[in-house]
């Protein structure tokens, strides 16, 4: 069992240095879990750390899913079989650049909900979630024959609030549900963060990426009887759309690691394993404007998004080997994982999904998603995502407006985050928050009754800071000239959960020539028997902005502004035979007529298109 004695950890009574790597099971295909864990162990890690995203397991109130890619028990058991201890961070808040910091969007349907506080409605839902989750974890603790050795209380709470009754409720809830291994907290290295995030009975750990010596001094001065640990060693970083790709020099961060280990500081590499925000699971930040996170979560990790062992892997392994025993590096891990050869994908269908098509798609799939509902009888205000239990995706809002003729300003108040505005089926414009594009359009139309369709997109729920818990949709209503529009119907599209239906809708034989809507195309991807199971890098650098599926699996978003210009497709999705790539494009390529979709040899993660970005924001 892992314990602590003064400034050091003990494992089964012997001094122990934790060398851990973060791997998010929710971001890795489950058939690749064992491979990535094996690579982590080969680097010298003796532990794996993972978050548990609440919303990944709870698609609707009282509905819980621990199957497939959400099979947490399988992941924990696989880690144990690869000879790794486990640090579990169950939240309920996780940050992690994950959709909403792990909070289900349906929590926000309650206007009185206050996240990360002792708000009774919030705590009731946390308790219901922990009743499902924590017993599964408790039976896999080290004293019970498993490999879970540490469990974290909340996450970086010192950067958010000071409701210590809330932290105590979480701590007591973990203990009451059977957690017996040591508890920890995790906060930035400033004392005000560490103190605000602390709770009695939990060991404080720090998150940082540099100035290790200063943080060791803080431990020695402020926490002399606590084993020093960097719970998040930020040797890399995440990317936002429209910004540069973040990397850090391998030798520089290896030097920080050397300082940690030589002074007895345990460490968790954040990230140890690069991965992917499949579907629409990316989060967002807000710093003067919305900053959605890209689809890739490669993070410049020692083990790349595709499993390749990077220079950082070897630099870290060398430092680790000087402090703890490191297993031999298996020869089959040295070469990069196989990838499909570069080729251009052959188009097989293309067209437009009109707003009527989107309505039909919504009504055909609404009953297949837990808790999802449409509004087919008009209501006075445009329903929000949360009111429809729409976690992610698109929302078609439809109304009819009596128009006197001529020009009129149309404003979408509180738009979160982006909308295509159609008048009588024709695209009038695109509006968005914080993109350099206005929330107001000037509409000119003949006198009469007009049909107004808004296709609203959530670009990712904010996962950190004071904007955490923002709702999605048109929150303040639609202003037509000098009056509100008050008769709305709503049709939700949970795109990442209805991939098969999306592909089928795009495959329908119909003439959409001259129609406005969201353009689509389908392409053939044929995999030979000797290529089966290889990964693919699907380059969208010649396309605009939208969503991409392989068969019924949504890989994620693409956007010409970069930095990411290709999407990673894991090999388990690519068996021998014919596959279909489906693209729904919300924005056409700038200055290009019709760009091809191609497979490329390597991931394109560092391709900020500055010209496209300037045009997008002009």
Where are these regions (language model features)?
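Aromatic-lined substrate-binding rim segments of carbohydrate-active enzymes
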Residues: 33-99, 171-176
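The substrate-binding groove and active-site-proximal loops of carbohydrate-active enzymes
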Residues: 18-30, 53-72, 108-128, 152-163, ...
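Aromatic- and acidic-residue-enriched segments that line the glycan-binding/catalytic groove
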Residues: 62-68, 81, 92-117, 167, ...
